[in-house]
């Protein structure tokens, strides 16, 4: 949404007056000189009081005589402190001065007096500072930031009494709005007091600060008695990703964007309670690609970008009366890159719109280099039809909003029917300085030239006076006309002043005879600024009488007769053009007169649940219609229902004798919601002319995207590429006859994919395969198996292409060159040569430039020297910065950039370099207790919890690999051990997986016989689980009985697992398809896996299938044998199918796996190789991939669509009431954490929406599963982890690493200039993720003042002085000595340990003791995945978040890969974060230098 306020840069300081000679037949002109250009100039309504601001000096000025004399506003504390000046949009008496130092001022009497108020807030451009109530001018929101040093957070204040009192409304809100935000909001709806008090605020998500998780909350009590309720934007459900709200006329709009798409959803309300999603006739609405325009009282006008953003054009849409359905008015409207649209409604006249469109739009779509040819068009029927502007017989084209030359409206004013503009006649619009001034006095029907050259212009005295000033350079005169622009006179500026005009304006209603001209004049080397008043009040003109006026029809039809709109004709009493008089009705705007018309087709719109038909002549159902009570007992019954039309609300047409399109008609019951369903699962099998498939991936439609497609792209073993838009029911081959060698789905946007050839030609789709566009690369793709395309995380169309140069013959001259494009390949620009990989670094978590790019380049552009430099730039390498001279690789994540830096001695060692901002790097301190003789390989895991996670390889012997997971502090530089002996395979991937959708649950397979493995024995695995993000790990509890009701051969102790009897599951390194994860991001609490019960994990062939419904606490055996599984409809459907054996049937569950039903999907046995659904697991469709193997088999690979949407139990949508979440088909589920009986995890309790398993309904689009974060808990030892150089013990204790010292705690004083104190090390540090408050402060016990900060320290600790300070310091020392002696003499552990103790009483070591804490390490990563689709031998690789493959030594083909989104082929199977989690390593460096690197 484009919200803008037009100002001019500059300021004023000194005022000096000049006066021209007074003449009876010309205006009086007086000039006031200022040293700085004035800004924020405005009139108070219905007055001659004008204000402006000197922003440079921080002063404000006021004039009470329409700009003749100016006085500085002198208030205590205001001098030099004014930051901005604002007028109230609807109250003509109020204005506001926002100050620089927390003091602000308000006037309620047009600047006669001022009231000071205080609010500690700083103002940034990201928030609109003042938000006004539409009906009560005393109600205002004040938005900004509260800053302490560099740490700033959003804060919103509110007042209900005009700032007599001010209170904090909410903190950390990203924008707030009153529900009643305009004077006409809710008119005729009898709004309740609650809605009048209602405020909507955009706030961060409950578990994530990123904008994709923003929520829209509302409160009717100023967030005092509640924390807000989520607005039910979409069919009664809350929506995440709300990016902004805006008000226009009687509507409030909210825009939301889902993660991994640039497409927006717009939601509209006209009563503050009921929201509807706006539909745009199939048009995509992109982020920052639409503009809410000036609208009417009965519809919204929105311009939506249609095509190339680099040469933006739009489509103009107009809504129905409730803002739900938008119809297309005109295509190819002219826009600019700032979102301004060449669109204006003619003031005071209903239905007349003036737009500019692009004549050569087809050429512009083909190339951004083509200059747009712009033409002007006008509509007299509210945008239904458009026609050219005519000046005589010639087409006229006028400069509009995209070329603003004045403040206020471009063409019109409240002067009835008078319209002006700068432009030219001919085939299209020329440059502004090639234009002339044109005028129309019949609201745009006919035009004539007024003045040569471009001029600024303004209307006065209801159009009796027009003033114009030359706008192509300096001028010393003005021009004016007293007869609608037919004839013109000139008047000179006083004292020979020549200015460059900046603003020409008058009072807002254009009823006065005074004007203001702002301009600048250059004398010698000085620039002088003037505010010039122009007054026609003393001219010898009589006052107009009755005979001087005419009845003027505002609109004419094609027969030149008064036209009807909204049920009436509109007329004005307007002064005749050629009479010699002034109206002199100051502050009295012209009042329209209306004459009613009989109802016609134009007076009706589509009713609720209906949309315009394709031909636009009828209204057809948009969805199944609600059934009338008592009707539709049988499918063939009929009932009386809506015709599809309704009279537009507010339309005043006469019913009698007119058209009645809204009369009820007879409808058939098949249109209703109660159509009986077949109750059957529908199957559609498709065979392909290939023996197998090489890969598939989903282009998933997100919640904010339009349509209902479920798009899959599949590649066969014969290299044919097929697409389905309906999840496999119908397939179509794309690019037949083309040799596609690479398919590269966008790393960050699921709507986008690129299809490449070896020649450099390619195609891309921006809309999930609905359309394909061709592009040409600057050079062919590289031949080094480097990533060809790199993507920007936030700018969808920004690309980096790494291609091959001088490579026709493979020789030493062949090298890689990087180019970049900001318009998806329409234009390319050179970036750097001799590169290996280049990436955009911008992330939402860091404030870096959008242009920040990192590249790996061979030193001295010589790949033979084996040294890769890490370089960065934010100006496309006009300048560059060298971060490291010899690196192996780097990984970019949401919060960190981690670099594998090669060591000097030994040469094959690695160090870790870390940066949080992309500017400054520091080396990481790895824990000494992770015994790694030489750091040679590590895997970068997830970093969304304000900490980085690494898997560090401890044993690198082939087939015997394992390592440790370590976790960093908040800046990624200091690491502690989390879990040892985690299994790793030869390629560097670890058996580690986080449960999706829940905090704190992760599973890992560890090597259970480390000592034997070190001697050469085969690895034996055990599965461990954590429910508190690594604070404690335990074996999986086995089921009490198997699926056949029999006991297992081993036994547990009281139901708890033992070393001899636990459940073990096969993990990532054993999966044929890495996308087959245990859990789903939408099936909260549910996991499936295959494995066995016993001492260790056994062979896969011996595995059975298990399920948990409570986050891994308890498990149940589903079936003997191993099955493949998939979640559908957010877990309300679970489908399993046998793995590695032929079958005709599948099993499905509708109650989270409690019971299962068998379904036969084929007559011929099939061997199913995979089962899939959309990445979010929200569809009711599944795909089985396999081959027929039984009698009567057909050749070729088959894709079998299994559709549950017609199943009776899944045909009705579940009901969720956000205000009463347990009232209908859902309940609130609170995860249980077995080691924390109070339910706290990271200092809070969480509650999730889950469907009741016994309800027969479907969930539909993905829920915001997390309903709330309940109680904030007091800090306990579980909210802390071991500090650097402290390590967790096997028995749960925390001890110093022998022989090592903690980090110097005084470093904070030098690293943070704001630091006042440092604390003595305690061995503990607070977990970055915890929200706990109060309680145990284990990390801060004994404070000390930083050097030269003693005074601030004593102010912070006022009691620590003199004797008191002595005892505070000495008491802990004495107590520590006493405890030390006691422990040394009484405790067998002696020094070096802090015992965990039991939960009961335990003296010093009880669970609540301040002296001890359990080490907590967050394990919140995702499984590393090689997201590969081999299309042509090692060349087709898909990565949603980034992929890089670097073969290492011997035959290992060491992989350095993204682990953040194997979801490539399945997009988001693990719901991975936007980190590019990678495997970094160094093996056999000499060989690795000459090896190839894999495809991104």
From Swiss-Prot:
Repeat region (BNR), residues: 61-71, 377-387, 438-448, 480-489, 722-732, 819-829, 1106-1116, 1148-1157
Record topological domains on the Cytoplasmic side: 1384-1409
Main location: Golgi
SMART domains: VPS10
Database matches in InterPro entries: Sortilin_C (IPR031777), Sortilin_N (IPR031778), VPS10 (IPR006581), VPS10-sortilin (IPR050310), WD40/YVTN_repeat-like_dom_sf (IPR015943)
GO terms for biological process, alphabetical: Golgi to endosome transport; Golgi to vacuole transport; protein targeting to vacuole
Leader sequence residues: 1-21
Protein topology in the membrane: Multi-pass membrane protein
Family according to the record: Belongs to the VPS10-related sortilin family.
Protein name: Vacuolar protein sorting/targeting protein 10
Organism listed in the record: Paracoccidioides brasiliensis (strain Pb18)
